[in-house]
């Protein structure tokens, strides 16, 4: 089947239409390509196909620096120019707001701002995670492929911080060596690096039980020279694993990053944006939207380890910060101490069940990919907040929630700003500014 790719989807595929009008999601193609494709799924309203030959390459198709583009799932847009990536992400957000949020095109044109981004196309990630697999009887490490059931073994990744070119290869080599004489029980391996603090942490995720601590720490220290080596022990069913303990094997036992006006120290299980410069764009947009004053009260929902809590605490009289994940709560308390901030009430628990009793002048919410529960929107509306910033990592749930906010009626949308935190992928962050009517 000959197809011309019209656009990029919110996913790895290009979008085309067959002669019969059906939408076709095409693996291995980018917008502007003309390809020969083989149909792998023919549904009632759409088809899926994979590229067998590129008949005429798109002017936006590039030769990526990574040989695993199209094989590994980590950089699914790696063969598309950055300019085209930015345009596609902005367009995907716009179309999602129209399709799911039911916003009129003219509303979208008025609200959506030009996409913000850093200059770094590659080498921007401060964290990389590897999955174990067995190759020829030996444990090897890799990443989920385009086919998520497969692991693509790698010992380098151009997305990882380029100031640490040997870190990934050294860790992979050390663990491959150790696996020859020890059953490490590895479930995954995380590596975090900071070009600002020079911190390098290796986190080994394993079940509870016996573990060759001294050998692992010695071999990893000799190979990669990390500032921290930790073991994260988890238990429970595979789809509901939870952290039971973090054990320091060597070094500091945590990872440190300088961001915005302060410093954050994070334990291995805690979430932190993988693009530090991109996270600073988010902070700037949130502070610009809220314009917090020194006599005001702020609420930070789903606050994590303090990405927005810390800058709010420097600007406001008092902050109530709510977070359900235990390791992040502990990290937030430690980060407040490190930054000498004592005007924050840290509330451990679900954002709806533990919604702060205090009122708010400004409020920021940064929920997980699932977005906000309707109850959360009602609770936010019940405050006296003059301005609200909503940080989202999923355009679909964002569009759904924005529709709910508009229908609820307390707040009006001011602007919606996409942010490219993840070059070479289809993912996009968004910062939304609401103002009380």
Language-model region placement:
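Short, solvent-exposed loop/turn elements at beta->coil junctions and helix N-caps
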Residues: 113-120, 187-192, 417-422
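Short beta-strand micro-motifs enriched in acidic
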Residues: 38-42, 131-135, 192-196, 435-437
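Carbohydrate-binding surface patches
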Residues: 190-194, 198-210
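Hydrophobic beta-strand signal
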Residues: 36-38, 129, 299
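Terminal RNA-binding accessory module
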Residues: 1-68, 98, 148, 345-347, ...
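Nucleotide donor/acceptor-binding cores
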Residues: 126, 200, 295-296
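Rossmann-like S-adenosyl-L-methionine
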Residues: 10, 211-437
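Extended interfacial segments that mediate partner engagement and assembly in macromolecular machines
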Residues: 52-64, 70-184, 196
């Amino acid at each position: 089947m000959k197809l011309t790719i019209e656009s990029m989807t919110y996913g790895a595929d290009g979008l085309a239409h067959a002669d019969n009008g059906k939408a076709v999601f095409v693996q291995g193609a980018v917008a502007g390509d003309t390809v020969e494709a083989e149909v792998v799924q023919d549904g009632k309203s759409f088809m899926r196909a994979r590229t067998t030959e590129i008949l005429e390459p798109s002017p936006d198709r590039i030769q990526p620096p990574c040989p695993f583009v199209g094989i590994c799932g980590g950089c699914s847009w790696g063969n598309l120019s950055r300019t085209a990536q930015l345009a596609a992400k902005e367009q995907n957000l716009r179309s999602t707001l129209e399709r799911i949020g039911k916003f009129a095109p003219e509303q979208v044109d008025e609200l959506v701002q030009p996409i913000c981004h850093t200059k770094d196309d590659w080498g921007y990630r401060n964290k990389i995670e590897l999955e174990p697999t067995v190759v020829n009887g030996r444990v090897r490490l890799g990443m989920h492929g385009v086919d998520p059931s497969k692991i693509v073994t790698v010992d380098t990744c151009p997305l990882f911080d380029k100031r640490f070119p040997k870190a990934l290869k050294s860790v992979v080599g050390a663990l491959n060596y150790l696996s020859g004489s020890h059953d490490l029980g590895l479930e995954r391996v995380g590596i975090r690096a900071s070009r600002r603090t020079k911190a390098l942490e290796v986190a080994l995720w394993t079940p509870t039980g016996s573990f060759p601590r001294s050998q692992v720490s010695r071999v990893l220290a000799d190979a990669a020279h990390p500032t921290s080596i930790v073991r994260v022990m988890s238990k429970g069913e595979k789809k509901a694993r939870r952290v039971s303990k973090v054990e320091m094997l060597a070094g500091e036992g945590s990872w440190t990053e300088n961001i915005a006006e302060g410093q954050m120290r994070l334990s291995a299980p805690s979430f932190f944006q993988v693009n530090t410069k991109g996270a600073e764009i988010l902070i700037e947009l949130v502070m610009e939207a809220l314009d917090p004053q020194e006599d005001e009260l702020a609420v930070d929902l789903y606050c994590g380890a303090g990405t927005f809590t810390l800058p709010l605490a420097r600007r406001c009289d008092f902050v109530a910060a709510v977070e359900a994940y235990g390791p992040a709560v502990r990290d937030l308390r430690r980060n407040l101490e490190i930054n000498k901030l004592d005007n924050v009430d840290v509330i451990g628990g679900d954002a709806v069940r533990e919604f702060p009793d205090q009122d708010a002048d400004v409020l920021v919410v940064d929920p997980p990919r699932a977005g906000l529960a309707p109850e959360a929107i009602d609770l936010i509306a019940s405050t006296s907040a003059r301005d609200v910033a909503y940080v989202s990592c999923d355009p679909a749930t964002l569009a759904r929630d924005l529709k709910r906010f508009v229908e609820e009626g307390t707040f009006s949308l001011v602007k919606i700003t996409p942010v490219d935190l993840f070059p070479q992928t289809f993912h996009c962050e968004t910062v939304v500014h609401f103002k009380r009517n």
